[in-house]
Amino acid sequence: MAVYTDINEIELGAFLRHYDIGTLTSYKGIAEGVENSNYLLHTSSGSFILTLYEKRTNREDLPFFLGLMQHLAKRGLECPQPVVRNDGAMIGQLAGRPAAIVTFLEGMWMRRPTVAHCEAVGEGLAHMHLAGADFPMRRRNGLTLPDWRPLWNLSRKCADTVERGLVAETEADLDFLEKNWPADLPQGVIHADLFPDNAFFLGDRLSGFIDFYFACTDILAYDVAVCLNAWCFEKDFSYNRTKGAALLRGYTSVRPLSEAEANALLVLARGAAVRFMLTRLYDWLTVPAGSFVVKKDPMEYVRRMRFHRQIESAAEYGLEMQGVAA
């Protein structure tokens, strides 16, 4: 979460008159994050999160994102719930931006996730996939295989200034992925960005997921692969198989992977690493110093890409056979 658009108390008060959430007592910006402007609101009725959607978020996608949160909450998944305005809408306008209010989720994200946290996230992700199975809306993943080559072409010319040989490495990975990407795996609603800062905990207990603004309809096992990349590598870029096994055990205890999904995990994990390397690389090369967008080091994901090239079976990620459906 972050703050790119400032608001004052007068315009906020006018905006809040469209909601039945009590009287505003205080508000403050939330500094973390990269995509939208977020504020923590305290009112006489409780705490809420106000989000102003910045230019990177397509307004046409907002009904999907907010509708998904509403749907998942009704299915018992812990996540922020959109607050409906007095006119029945979930989206308003504030400071020239589309804006929405969601409920406040208790907990904090884990900067050093443990094995227990990884298992809980895997289990929670599987519950999310099942809860989203009957969500009627669809949204194409705008950052999947067909999008990677065009995104890469925007950075390709300067990529070797980040790391010598990165052009050749990335070209080889994209060639491999385009030839081997699975076509017929189970699809549904995925989070697509379930990094540690998007999962809240109270102690070791998962209290819920946040930030559904990359959610889309895509391969379910790809979401698992994103999590393996996001949760199971240490600061020295080594893969923690114990954490991987815990995450996969948690997931498959709720939703076992098919044999085809298990066999595709290598390709999906490699693809997930490429996806996040490419977006980081683009920002690294194009976002000017002092910009509100927080640049993240693409080399963290180059190192993951190199790891995945050496993997020969899903067992090396920690997948146990009892987690694979017969």
Swiss-Prot record:
Family: Belongs to the pseudomonas-type ThrB family.
Catalysed transformations (reactions): L-homoserine + ATP = O-phospho-L-homoserine + ADP + H(+)
Name assigned to this protein: Homoserine kinase
Gene: thrB
Single GO biological process annotation from the record: threonine biosynthetic process
Pathway noted in the entry: Amino-acid biosynthesis; L-threonine biosynthesis; L-threonine from L-aspartate: step 4/5
Protein's UniProt keywords contain Endoplasmic reticulum: no
Listed EC numbers: 2.7.1.39
Top-rank EC class of the record's enzyme: transferase
SUPFAM superfamilies xrefs: Protein kinase-like (PK-like) (SSF56112)
